[in-house]
Amino acid sequence: MAKHLFTSESVSEGHPDKIADQISDAVLDAILEQDPKARVACETYVKTGMVLVGGEITTSAWVDIEEITRNTVREIGYVHSDMGFDANSCAVLSAIGKQSPDINQGVDRADPLEQGAGDQGLMFGYATNETDVLMPAPITYAHRLVQRQAEVRKNGTLPWLRPDAKSQVTFQYDDGKIVGIDAVVLSTQHSEEIDQKSLQEAVMEEIIKPILPAEWLTSATTFFINPTGRFVIGGPMGDCGLTGRKIIVDTYGGMARHGGGAFSGKDPSKVDRSAAYAARYVAKNIVAAGLADRCEIQVSYAIGVAEPTSIMVETFGTEKVPSEQLTLLVREFFDLRPYGLIQMLDLLHPIYKETAAYGHFGREHFPWEKTDKAQLLRDAAGLK
């Protein structure tokens, strides 16, 4: 493989689309806490001074949509009208109905293991050994930059920062291996009083340098810090936000394929979400077992049918055992039926709001990040 560049981006928790994702998942968590069998498809729209929460929810639980919304916006940091969005005064509108009975009859079963998929679709999972969390480096470090932005904003290190921010990192590869970072973009919302020179110096010293490994930065690395020169108007005042519009940020930063389905606001019966988590779990365990350096899993479903319609394993020529054997191992050690994967990953808990910013993958405390099957796979493959 020749030398090449690869770029991924991330956005902060204060980005309008991420506000929407977090509200949708906060509603989901509140419902699952009371009713683990609830059916939830919650969508959120945010714009200056307003939040609209809609979707289809079937549950025995009662939750206060307005309170959940305000608390979520408050935690993100939009608490003053001079930011163009204020948790205390924004309008909160609700337009929620029930899940179609036509879908229910295809999902619910007397035998839970025969629970059908909530929709047709295809999902991908991916892992690579180029980082400690078995994720692609570009998206991993893009996430870490905006996480650091939120950290120094909230702890008062840089009090003039505001919640909306974006990052982008371009890595240099040579024969598939990282050799450096070519370019870094970081744009952060800020208050009026900070001048651009001071902002750029502070962002470099407090955000970029503590996060990006020095050995990957060279005199040729280009830094773009607030390249428009001003970013005071941001958040929902700058752009409207919608649930499910950051699906590449949520996954692998473009390094792997994507089936098209968003995650946030969906309960685990929706395979768009749960099967994508399971596919990551499978791919990560294959790489952790040393059966491949890179692994991409595709799984697909028909609505109302329990068994996947297909399972594909792609290892990009890095496999240590034949690909056909890998597929057999996946079928043997992982139950990818909707109920099976819910049980395998213990998904019927309020764990989703935290996934809604800084990526659904690569953070070790999520259950789909476990590598508990790596040794089983290695032994079954006959590797010493």
UniProtKB/Swiss-Prot annotation:
A Pfam family: S-AdoMet_synt_N
Chain residues that bind ATP: H15, D164, A165, K166, R230, F231, D239, R245, K246, A262, K266
InterPro entries per the UniProt record, alphabetical: ADOMET_SYNTHASE_CS, S-AdoMet_synt_C, S-AdoMet_synt_central, S-AdoMet_synt_N, S-AdoMet_synthetase, S-AdoMet_synthetase_sfam
A single cellular component GO annotation: cytoplasm
Keywords assigned by UniProt, alphabetized: ATP-binding, Cytoplasm, Magnesium, Metal-binding, Nucleotide-binding, One-carbon metabolism, Potassium, Transferase
Record bears the keyword Cell inner membrane: no
Catalytic activity reported: L-methionine + ATP + H2O = S-adenosyl-L-methionine + phosphate + diphosphate
GO biological process: one-carbon metabolic process; S-adenosylmethionine biosynthetic process
EC number: 2.5.1.6
Highest taxon in the source lineage: Bacteria
Start and end residues of each stretch annotated as Flexible loop: 99-109
Binding site for Mg(2+): D17
Residues holding K(+): E43
Stated role: Catalyzes the formation of S-adenosylmethionine (AdoMet) from methionine and ATP. The overall synthetic reaction is composed of two sequential steps, AdoMet formation and the subsequent tripolyphosphate hydrolysis which occurs prior to release of AdoMet from the enzyme.
Quaternary structure and partners: Homotetramer; dimer of dimers.
NCBIfam families reported in the protein's UniProt record: metK (TIGR01034)
Protein name (Swiss-Prot/TrEMBL): S-adenosylmethionine synthase
